[in-house]
Amino acid sequence: MLSPMKKVCSLVLFVSLLAGLEFPDLDLILIFILDHRSIITHGILIPLFLYRYLTKEGKQNLINKYLSKILTSKKIKNEILDYAYIGFLIGIAIHLCADLFPKAYIGYALIKLPFFISIGAPLSIAWMLGNIFFALKIAFTKLNEKDLKEKSKNLIFLAIMIIGIIYLIIDSNFVSKITLMVISFPIIWIYARKGYKIIKR
């Protein structure tokens, strides 16, 4: 049975996951600044740098400003930030699984640099695959560092898979997308867990 705090953290993870699913398409709202499939939103650059900034020593004033009235413990604030980061990265990874299988690698299917410069099909594929791997590796490693029972971790992973499949199945060419997910996610999950256990020893 999860404690109330762990239930809150799990909720934060899944809400952040849903936010991460939608985050890459933020470029559609900013289409006059960022072309669709912008390298800035279709990857882990923003969450990675934001998380590193917020977890730096002396850089937690933003967290304290918005959460101090609700949460008094620095440890709890950091836990919530960690779970939000984990969920957000996983959401981006699922979204990129969908983006890897367009009808054709032309136009909006390609990753764009600032100033609407396309990086081409091969680099677009490599970028998305690389970001899927690193997003999941970071997220799953951090999740396995958490003080949760193995059963709870496995249930969270199962829920992630179910959410991902539901998200992908409503899209076109869903068989290829789901196949990529059901192969890559468990492999990286196992890889992240084994790596964590080796470090822990």
What function would you assign to each model-found segment?
Residues 1-201:
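N-terminal membrane-targeting hydrophobic helices
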